[in-house]
């Protein structure tokens, strides 16, 4: 399972590809938000409360999914580091 990580001060990001989906998980303190997409990369992005958490919303655009993830963490979207392996997520 390939992984990649990035750090931007108080927010860390971990990208992983499982057998069924790609996951970009952000952590800030004890809060987590995950942007997930199917492995093939053509489905909408799901925003969850962590990798296996409750799905909150689905988006076509990566930017919109990042906005929601940032909101869940209480930061602005610019505070979210995106590992290189995850830069092509979205439709």
Question: PLM features: residue spans?
Answer:
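Acidic, polar-rich N-terminal leader regions of halophilic archaeal proteins
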Residues: 1-91
């Amino acid at each position: 399972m390939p992984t990649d990580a990035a750090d931007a001060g108080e927010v860390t990001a971990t990208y992983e590809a499982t057998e069924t989906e790609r996951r970009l998980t952000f952590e800030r303190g004890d809060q987590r938000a995950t942007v997930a997409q199917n492995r093939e990369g053509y489905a909408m992005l799901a925003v969850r409360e962590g990798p296996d958490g409750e799905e909150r919303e689905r988006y076509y655009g990566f930017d919109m999914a990042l906005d929601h993830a940032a909101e869940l963490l209480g930061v602005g979207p610019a505070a979210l580091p995106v590992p290189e392996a995850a830069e092509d997520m979205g439709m």
